[in-house]
């Protein structure tokens, strides 16, 4: 059994992904980060029987923790990874946290006059800019971090780029999906230095999770 200093640190995001990833870890290794962390104010919990330490952090920060070596392994949405590319090893699509980054605009809105740059409200500044640039559309990107769906109705933007699971919030705010930008799911990411320092232990972890993902997929079919 590894000592405390030898535990592999896994950064798991708070919220929905914590619950979904916990089911995979429980299937793969018999440990649930959600159960270890719930009922406590601590943001870290050890599972020495599995050789792991789990830390619960904001979803948008997981990639930074792993890239800079504060955690060896993490779970990150593909939207985060493509918005700000990182030097990380991405060995596995976990098949959880499925959503879509979309372009949406008010239902029934008239097309903008030719040559007028659309005002695009979004938290995905890079994804949105690249998407419109690839279409040859000079868009004005307006950075927002919440309540993005109301931006068109308040006259702040002509369209939005946002992430959605069911589209219900979009419809409730009078928006319709115009385009899909990126299909998103959670990815397992690994620090590249850690991969060289602990190749066998990380290989076993990756393969255990790969088997759990395959089993979950087989059950869903």
UniProtKB/Swiss-Prot annotation:
Keywords: Amino-acid biosynthesis, ATP-binding, Cytoplasm, Glycosyltransferase, Histidine biosynthesis, Nucleotide-binding, Transferase. The keyword Ribonucleoprotein does not apply. Catalyzes the condensation of ATP and 5-phosphoribose 1-diphosphate to form N'-(5'-phosphoribosyl)-ATP (PR-ATP). Has a crucial role in the pathway because the rate of histidine biosynthesis seems to be controlled primarily by regulation of HisG enzymatic activity. It comes from the Bacteria. Pathway: Amino-acid biosynthesis; L-histidine biosynthesis; L-histidine from 5-phospho-alpha-D-ribose 1-diphosphate: step 1/9. Lacks the C-terminal regulatory region which is replaced by HisZ. Its main location: cytoplasm. Heteromultimer composed of HisG and HisZ subunits. It is found in: Cytoplasm. The gene is hisG. One of its GO terms (molecular function) is ATP binding. The keyword Glycosyltransferase applies. It catalyses: 1-(5-phospho-beta-D-ribosyl)-ATP + diphosphate = 5-phospho-alpha-D-ribose 1-diphosphate + ATP. InterPro entries: ATP_PRibTrfase_cat (IPR013820), ATP_PRibTrfase_CS (IPR018198), ATP_PRibTrfase_HisG (IPR001348), ATP_PRibTrfase_HisG_short (IPR024893). Pfam families: HisG (PF01634). It comes from Anaeromyxobacter sp. (strain K). Its EC number is 2.4.2.17. GO terms for biological process: L-histidine biosynthetic process. Belongs to the ATP phosphoribosyltransferase family. Short subfamily. This is ATP phosphoribosyltransferase. One of its GO terms (cellular component) is cytoplasm.
